[in-house]
Amino acid sequence: ATLRGDFRDDSRPGRGDDFRAIRGDGSMSAAFAAVNRSKRGIAVDLAHPEGRRVAFALGRRADVLIENFLPGVAERQGLGYAAVSAAKPGIVYAYVTGFGQDGPLARRPGYNLIAQGMAGIMALTGHPGDPPTRAGGSISDLAASFLTFGMVQAALVHRARGGRGQHLDVNLLAS
């Protein structure tokens, strides 16, 4: 978040990001602090119209919007690519999910451990004869975040060269 941008992390009111407490005292872990350095946090309750209005207003002012809801959730909230790009045609909008926006697993939640197992990464780690072993670190999450970063940068260059905003679909399994 130190690339000279204004970054916001929208979280649930009263709960925040689950990553905040990993290996920490419950307030902020070192991992959370490293990943979220220089970001400004805001709590928005998308279950209420005012929360959706605030989120939409932020999206309309943004150059890039990245969300990680299950497919269809942002659309039901009026915050999907079609709605935001109608208000801000140049938006670069990235969906980051476990399994992509369509396909047989699209509606299922996904996280690092599931992606590692389904991608076969766990079969490649550990010792011969042992059951599948989780790779150290959240490799699927990291791969998806690096892929999202690269795709967003390419989309911003495309837009700067006279193109339009873009809709990006990133998922943990394919990353």
Positions of PLM-derived features:
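N-terminal helix-loop segment corresponding to the beta1-alpha1 unit
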Residues: 1-167, 172
